[in-house]
């Protein structure tokens, strides 16, 4: 069976045929590392990690590259506000990024290049664009001449005249056309900068990815992916830069994931409704957040709320219960083979359905439905006192196979959570017995474990401390 991918470039699903049989070159735009990542950043990390895992499951050798933007206006602003230098802030939040996405079940990319480590390549790329007549220098700044590239607008499906409407040249900008964009920005106000043929400065945002893709993956790649908000102008500008330089198609397939809304409102700083992964994973099982993200097709928007996350947790726990019950039944399993063929065929049918759904533009929402159908069949099998070791192992094996691709685990977490819950119950018992000394002692013990308690009318809640 073939994999079909919805290609933003053509606005249709296409059969996935990599440039080189059996191998996939994939690039995902990474974060600007000036703060902890929010759930809007987490969605592409989870989505494209799952795409990568499914491609590998399907037998492809995937070379997966995702960058860090470690110099940018936002980073410079954060450095000024905190009184620290840009590299220190970037290092801190790159480490925080790895911790957060690791908790969410994401593998590291094969390579995580940083902008600041590739400055020579970026400068050389810009020089070539100038030589070819696609860019021009203006008093230390360098701009890309958008009208020089005939295909501009093909990714976002807009004509250059449509884009021209509403475009403005800001005060102080030296570009010739309102649609032109910066490849190199002259240094100002003693901000971090690098030497270049045009004087001290730093690169524009769009050129960074073009240069790093070319350096680490080549002129043309199989899959370029990122959030829907990057389609224009970022990815459109990447195409203009890269195809002008090489004369070749930049990427064969373009994938974009949908937005996340918070309580039915668009997530934005002005609304103050950013939700940091750093905070969620202190209170929630990270697997539940990943499960939540994959419960909706990646191209569709997601509405996030704590109520929805709690509902997702309940559904996730039902799967965990079925999986745990299979393991318990395995302990008393037998070698009876009656009806094995029928039940093994049912398991294989679910495997085939999982593959079919994932082959259809990585439909994780329907793939998760397969898990619930598998759980339903497993529950029926056990409720009717079937005990075949072969069948039980087949159910367990397919649960593990699917969840390893989707990137979460149904294994019971026996460590911190259970210990904390047991201590809270002991403390509640002490309080009921008015043994406040023991109650305080248990609270102090939990505090030493970095666990913060909150006593409410509905009971005691806990979370991990800062």
Swiss-Prot record:
InterPro entries named in the record: Cys-tRNA-ligase (IPR015803), Cys-tRNA-synt_Ia_DALR (IPR015273), Cys-tRNA/MSH_ligase (IPR024909), CysS_C (IPR056411), Rossmann-like_a/b/a_fold (IPR014729), tRNA-synt_1_cat_dom (IPR032678), tRNAsynth_Ia_anticodon-bd (IPR009080)
Main location group: cytoplasm
GO biological process: cysteinyl-tRNA aminoacylation
Cofactor: Zn(2+)
The reaction(s) this protein catalyses: tRNA(Cys) + L-cysteine + ATP = L-cysteinyl-tRNA(Cys) + AMP + diphosphate
Residues recorded with modification Phosphoserine: 270
Organism superkingdom: Bacteria
Alphabetically ordered keywords of this record: Aminoacyl-tRNA synthetase, ATP-binding, Cytoplasm, Ligase, Metal-binding, Nucleotide-binding, Phosphoprotein, Protein biosynthesis, Zinc
Top enzyme category: ligase
UniProt subcellular location: Cytoplasm
Amino acids binding Zn(2+): 29, 209, 234, 238
Entry GO terms, CC: cytosol
Ranges spanned by the short sequence motif 'KMSKS' region, renumbered to the chain: 266-270
Family according to the record: Belongs to the class-I aminoacyl-tRNA synthetase family.
Subunit structure and binding partners: Monomer.
Protein name, entry field: Cysteine--tRNA ligase
Organism, as annotated: Bacillus pumilus (strain SAFR-032)
Taxonomic classification: Bacteria, Bacillati, Bacillota, Bacilli, Bacillales
